């Protein structure tokens, strides 16, 4: 099934009639590193696919951010295309969104340099994610890792973004972006940047690790058994669910004091749409093995069409690249207009 090229999306809403409300703009970026997992799908991708017609959506594969940690060139290229295919396979539709690669729009690094000149060092020193990734060797990591919150802010502000879908653990980055925008606007006494708001995910946002249900499922977790990747085959899914942490009790019920079984039930609930009461009733006379078997079957059924579509998209790279090029062509005028406005305001050119 070929990818449908979007001929309807415009780079700016200037052609809207006076009676046509302009849609709010949503921006989201994700690095082409690691594997997209079930938490990404239930907490973000599925919801984006369901609500994409309501917004002016810009989805960016932030390959420049991926350079902050060591990665082989061919691995980066392959991961970028695979991620693009997975986005589309999960239901993103180019009639309602633009999907592009960050490095294909040169305004990103140029704006990042400008904004870095307006960002106090103290703001960057407070960013907890750098401290986490740098670990005990902060002097050996790249400057890019230290400064990447500025590039992230630039990604958002370039497109005059209204909303940024984020998890609760990314609140700090949104506040950082808002601080930069407000500081710049205040300094020059005009509304150069739209002040973005974070859309904090709720449904499916707290999918926890299978091996340690006290922490979130993460693509950066060194233990592959901690997560269900969207491209895991049925055998792998079965093994991971079979080894998922539970407890010594037998009652299948939602209980915050029993995070392991509650995590599996939460995943089952997100996949089936059933209420807690309906699920507990379904498994009232059954045990953990029955729940794990039912959950495995539901996961395999849910992910099979996504995996098939992903395979089809990667089998036709010219068409996939054309979609990414079109996305970049559509959004570049927005980024260029914002960058030019900034240059005019600060006296460049």
Predicted regions located by residue number:
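A broad, structure-centric signal for solvent-exposed, well-ordered loop/edge residues
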Residues: 33, 74, 99, 106, ...
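Pocket-edge structural micro-motifs
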Residues: 28-30, 101, 160, 211, ...
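N-terminal Rossmann-like or analogous alpha/beta NTP/dinucleotide-binding catalytic cores
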Residues: 2-154, 311
